[in-house]
């Protein structure tokens, strides 16, 4: 069964746009929590946020953007989103290379938060509305996204109480699930 948010619920996902929007809200909450965190909470909170952001970007790149590119026929918009993801990966690597006692740690997390916030605004204001009107089977795509995300969360140990065991991997190397084609129904 596909989870509705990054591991905290087992609700079924309504559609791809809803799933990604929920991820965006969760990431915003994590960045806000970082800003209010105690010194002891900074490292684990930043690590969890980076892991979830990597997973979110990966499912968008593997499944969502290919469908969005075909549906919108707007290569420039998707190319820009992918460039922003590449920049975010560099910012994530910078955060992950530091600990909270590093002088630039909070600034690096703040830069990542600003970058992610700008990207989210762009997706939610331009890309998501276009996909809603493009005739894409967003429910089937949402199921594919949720299944892939769940696999990645499990691989990183983010569904378990022990996050740090398998979670030290920087990149998850599993074959991507195939995104449903436009109009294709996904079997149960």
What residue spans do the PLM features occupy?
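Small-residue-biased structural context
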Residues: 1-188
């Amino acid at each position: 069964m596909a989870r509705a948010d990054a591991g905290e619920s087992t609700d079924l996902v309504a559609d791809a746009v809803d799933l990604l929007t929920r991820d965006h809200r969760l990431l915003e909450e994590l960045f806000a929590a970082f800003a209010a965190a105690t010194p002891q909470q900074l490292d684990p909170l930043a690590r969890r946020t980076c892991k979830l952001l990597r997973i979110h970007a990966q499912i968008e790149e593997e499944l969502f953007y290919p469908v969005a590119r075909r549906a919108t026929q707007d290569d420039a918009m998707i190319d820009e989103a992918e460039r922003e993801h590449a920049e975010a990966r560099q910012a994530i690597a910078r955060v992950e290379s530091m600990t909270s006692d590093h002088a630039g740690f909070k600034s690096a997390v703040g830069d990542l938060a600003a970058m992610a916030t700008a990207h989210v605004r762009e997706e939610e204001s331009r890309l998501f509305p276009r996909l809603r009107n493009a005739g894409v089977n967003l429910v089937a795509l949402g199921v594919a996204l949720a299944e892939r995300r769940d696999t990645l969360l499990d691989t990183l140990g983010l569904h378990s109480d022990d996050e740090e065991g398998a979670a030290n991997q920087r990149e998850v190397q599993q074959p991507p699930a195939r995104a449903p084609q436009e109009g294709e129904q996904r079997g149960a």
